[in-house]
């Protein structure tokens, strides 16, 4: 089949299926693609092609993820589905697959299970704003009352973790029946996508966020001044705008008097650009790798925060042994490592390889971080874990 043209007139939204093992996440993903393909809005995909998820690397961690794309009348979607529970945890914590909203799949035959709870919590921690629920396998439950009870249980669970349990849409259906072409259940897939279209909000575009660029390198141009290079993470910057140099040292304000990309002078730098910024009145020693250049007042340096972390298993190249309270690894933010200590939640003595835990981190130097900032945990340059900042402490 010919490649679908990328239609820029449609809003682009990133979604993903989450939920307990064997509740039907991958079958639902295949059903969405297949039902929409009948309207010419997607390529049909079978279960096997999605389940056979390719490996990718994010922050030094290997993750299996399937990416598929499809359209509705309103939007263009990128949809991620992971084969295993650990892949979900790693995906969310590394931010490898950004989600503007999630489709929570719950089997009506089982109701919410341990991983249902875990995925909802993780979604909240990494900042997934909204969730739509697909109640799967409804063809296997005869008792209407039973399905109603499962729905109530899901709403309570969503509310417990800070989602809007009262108003989240819950669509009843059967992904397998829809995939097999049963018209009644195909309509349920369209009903689900309609809920996703309306309930999951358009994301704030990276360009509309306040400017931020992590400094990768610094050099001096004789007679002109100091240039900091890096990739613009978000926002836009125009010539002669003020920026702050944040992190590692006291925050300092400067004006950008030149923007260069591929040896050409530009009037502005945009999210995604690799740019060199000429900084007025800044010495070579005032700015270093690991700091960020940001819109004044938009981000401040911190040393203490809470985080959700995933610790790599031995088989994934991680530690072979647990770590304890006096553990002091390096925390790699954007472009640099900073040493820090960890504090566990009450009652926890150690953290085992393969665990997903919440802990408090205290860095020895302040770094520009905010809720949602992602980092790697490293020992001597080797990645042993990944984390996402869930709450700023200091």
Curated annotation (Swiss-Prot):
Region G3, residue ranges: 81-84
Enzyme class, spelled out: hydrolase
Xref: InterPro entries: EF-Tu_GTP-bd (IPR041709), EF-Tu_GTPase (IPR050055), EFTu-like_2 (IPR004161), EFTU_2 (IPR033720), G_TR_CS (IPR031157), P-loop_NTPase (IPR027417), Small_GTP-bd (IPR005225), T_Tr_GTP-bd_dom (IPR000795)
Known EC number: 3.6.5.3
G5: region residues: 174-176
Keywords associated with the record: Cytoplasm, Elongation factor, GTP-binding, Hydrolase, Magnesium, Metal-binding, Nucleotide-binding, Protein biosynthesis
SUPFAM superfamilies per the UniProt record, alphabetical: EF-Tu/eEF-1alpha/eIF2-gamma C-terminal domain, P-loop containing nucleoside triphosphate hydrolases, Translation proteins
Any Pfam family: GTP_EFTU_D2
Domain of life: Bacteria
List of residues binding Mg(2+): 26
Keyword Cell membrane: no
CDD domains on file: EF_Tu (cd01884), EFTU_II (cd03697), EFTU_III (cd03707)
Enzymatic reactions: GTP + H2O = GDP + phosphate + H(+)
One GO location term (cellular component): cytosol
Region (G2): 60-64
Region (G1): 19-26
Residues involved in GTP binding: 19-26, 81-85, 136-139
GO molecular function: GTP binding; GTPase activity; translation elongation factor activity
Compartment(s) of residence: Cytoplasm
tr-type G domain location: 10-204
Entry similarity comment: Belongs to the TRAFAC class translation factor GTPase superfamily. Classic translation factor GTPase family. EF-Tu/EF-1A subfamily.
Subunit structure and binding partners: Monomer.
NCBIfam families from the UniProt entry: EF-Tu, PRK00049.1, PRK12735.1, PRK12736.1, small_GTP
Protein name, entry field: Elongation factor Tu
Upper lineage: Bacteria, Bacillati, Mycoplasmatota, Mycoplasmoidales, Metamycoplasmataceae
